[in-house]
Amino acid sequence: MRTRTSLRRLQLIAVAATTVAIATACPAEPTGPSVPPVPGIAMNPQLSGGYFSMPWPNDIRRSDSGMNDWTSLPGINTDIFTEPLPPIPLLPEIVAKGQTTVNQFGRQTAVFFQANVELAAASLPAPDQTTSSGASVLLMDLATGELAPTVVVNQERADRFRPAHLLTVLPYPGHPLRSDARYAALVFDDVTSTSGDALTPSATLAQLDQPYDPSMPMTAAQHANLAGQYTDVKSAIANHTTHQLSDLVAFTVYRTQKTEREWDAIVAAMADVPTPTVNVTSTGACTPSSRDVGASMSIVKATISLPIWRNGSFPYLFEGGKVVVQPNGKAQQFGNRTAPVELMVPCSTMPAAGWPIVTHMDGTGGDEQIGTDIPIARRNGVLYGKISPLYGDGVGDAGAILSPLGFSSPRAQAEVLFYNLLNPDSIRSNPLQQAAEQLMFTKALESFSVPGAPFGQPGNVHGDASKVMITGHSQGAQTLPMIAAADPSIDGVISSSGSGGQYHTLAHSPRRLNTLSLVTNYADRLDELNPLIQVVQTVFEASDGANFANDTNFLNYTNYDDTCSVVETGLHFSRAQNLAIVPFTAPTSYGSTALDNGSVPSLPVQGNYGGTTRVSILLPGGHFNYMQNVDKSTAFQDGLFATGIATVPVGPYGYSSANCPGDRYDDPPRRFGI
């Protein structure tokens, strides 16, 4: 059985983990006064100076089958002689599996260079300066010469996960790099030590200008790859910077993932699947809706058959969950599942073309039941459908494993499964499967038609496929950009607590830290720029909402004190979606007002993005602020359906302290982990 197999596997791995210890070296005998190091940055392909003695990422650290060396990341093993085992001692195995899930690097992840001295913060560029061709540290698109805005910091505090003097270059949050593009990170000699000494060029640079020699500290293949990179870097410096080649201290070149690959494959395969039928199982009486003033509505219970786009067996706690892209570019289907759904049908005169269609997906722990839910927008005059978020209608046999670990409620178990840090394939594909299910449900409602008699209407009651909106909260909001990108006919999106750049949530949300504590005893060290967190983001990139651009009408709510979708991830999401941020409280910043929010429009806003309306409202308060703004969301929805033009109305906008359990985590004094 799946439960016994998983438990037995966990026990065997736990026993195996007890044989792992971190090797330590005895200190050398003192030999006299130490000689100060010549300031520089390591570029050692053989990693003789540690994991980051070769910049990460770099294309020599990958292959077509995956990453080459994630299992050597510092801090992932446990020394059983000096440290207690974490509750699930699987981190080395998880990382080993993670490095097979991707074969290119992240669009939103950091670059790490290891210096041998403390660097002067004043010699590093501020975010606004990183797009200047003369900045001391640059991140460049090699195909176009475009400079990416970044946050450049020197991490001086060493811990089990990283060495000291770790120069870190993070794409500015909300400004992801291009998909499937080669980037070069460049460090120049106007970066100095705290003593004022300029960094000296890595000795590797001179070796790359020479024919390969076996005495060089690299293989012939590494030399050939790096020499090719260096040729491209030379051209980039000459053509797109004000620096001289002699200014260069160190570089790294890498390709970003084609993050849309799996999602495009699923969408292409869905086109070959007949639109499923919404199979009605019961039709409720027409009754007044307490949440939809003046409306008489019927709740219709139904089921729908949905394709499964992941291999393996549900619920994918430890294994399975991979999206398999076939040679024809389409995702392989692995059967179907029957999902419960509910509809709310107006008991009033239907427009000639049918009812406008709205589908909704709730947050983690939610389900398909409409009941007394507080909707994002009122449902008067629309055909409203609700589908469960992934794992909201069942967690399979995972409960037997997770309950003894403290995750006893279905909601807690659903969260562990959706944000599944125990299975890299699953954490990467869960949002893809979820997005596919809401998209297919939306398509099914576009062709939904039933006799109108139960609703007091002649003929049939049906939807109007020319007027469609998708909505979601939290987990359900995270995947809305994918759906909108896949189906440009969707007229609008209303998103509550949308999230992008999931490394923010991993670092700050108390619930994600609780999950991380299953596999490491050092979750308090997992700040935003922790390399392990950046590796997780690399795996997650294919389903991060920040990577899926669309241009439909879009209203989002971000909440400053949110402990589920933390404010950093909400603003990251908003920027990446090109949503104009209207702040009702001071926004957080990574150092650049211009990069945080190019312009702040005055409400009301209409057609601010090429004719469509795209706005994110930043509010004080907690995770459920959308409940305080149903009138505003309704105005956005109804105006769009009535006129084809969406308007974000004037305030005031409400907020409350209602929130997820727990307090957000910050690594004092660093709110952002930088």
Model-derived features with residue positions:
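C-terminal motif of bacterial Sec signal peptides marking the signal peptidase cleavage site
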Residues: 22-25
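Alpha/beta-hydrolase fold nucleophile elbow
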Residues: 457-474
